[in-house]
Amino acid sequence: MEDIVIVGRHAVKEAIVSGHTINKIWIQEGIRKQQINDILQNAKEQKLIVQTVPKSKLDNLANAPHQGVAALIAPYEYADFDQFIQSQKDKEGLSTVVILDGLEDPHNLGSILRTADASGVDGVIIPKRRSVALTQTVAKASTGAIQHVPVMRVTNLAKTIDELKEHGYWVAGAEADNATDYRDMAADMPLAIVIGSEGQGMSRLVKDKCDFYIKIPMVGHVNSLNASVAASLMMYEVYRKRHQVGDNA
């Protein structure tokens, strides 16, 4: 796999701090050093290559706003599913994973990773086919959360769900019909939340594997939410049910 370019101050900073392999950092000419002091300091401590370049070079490297900073890094590695399951056996508290069935928008995946990190979700599972991969755009949208949330890429989602069930997980599918209000769902057990694709929802095989279905009430004129918005509401509902007000653990 080829190295990839990431852009933006948050994404680059988190890549450095997390220990990701970084081959080069580009800084825009004329940028105020105090705006990127943390990046420069961390890069110096790790003896990383830093080059000052014209804005035009960063514009050519990036397909998104770059804030005057970019980096060439090693490809993102996917977490191993079996190792992840083992790690969850040793953790305190109840495990939560999010399964994305056919999500193809990189901005949605990045946003979901950002909320997953913020709400304490333990991991995200995506299929190898019909799904966006971990790309520069995903990294930018996640504002660095891509470095902290394990993402597992599996061949067969239905089989993976069976394995999750064997390890005690209950599987909740986001579904509009014949579903429980997400505010009434149980969260006192290891939980896997399935979010379907933006256009088609969950595939039939995956849908049939769910233990129960949850929905978000819609009282306006539109009948659906963006996948990342729906996922965020559900992730934080799990957090709300498991933590008292003032408990930031």
Curated annotation (Swiss-Prot):
Binding site for S-adenosyl-L-methionine: 196, 216, 225
Family that this chain belongs to: Belongs to the class IV-like SAM-binding methyltransferase superfamily. RNA methyltransferase TrmH family.
InterPro entries, A to Z: Alpha/beta_knot_MTases, Ribosomal_eL30-like_sf, rRNA_MeTrfase_TrmH, SpoU_MeTrfase, SpoU_subst-bd, tRNA_m1G_MTases_N
Lineage, broadest ranks: Bacteria, Bacillati, Bacillota, Bacilli, Bacillales
Enzyme category, top tier: transferase
GO biological process: methylation; RNA processing
One annotated Gene Ontology cellular component of this protein: cytosol
EC number, as in UniProt: 2.1.1.-
Name of the protein: Putative TrmH family tRNA/rRNA methyltransferase
Gene Ontology molecular-function annotations: RNA binding; RNA methyltransferase activity
Keyword Methyltransferase assigned: yes
Classification via Gene3D superfamilies: 3.30.1330.30, 3.40.1280.10
Keywords: Methyltransferase, Transferase
UniProt xrefs under NCBIfam families: rRNA_methyl_3
Keyword Transferase part of the UniProt annotation: yes
CDD domains: SpoU-like_RlmB
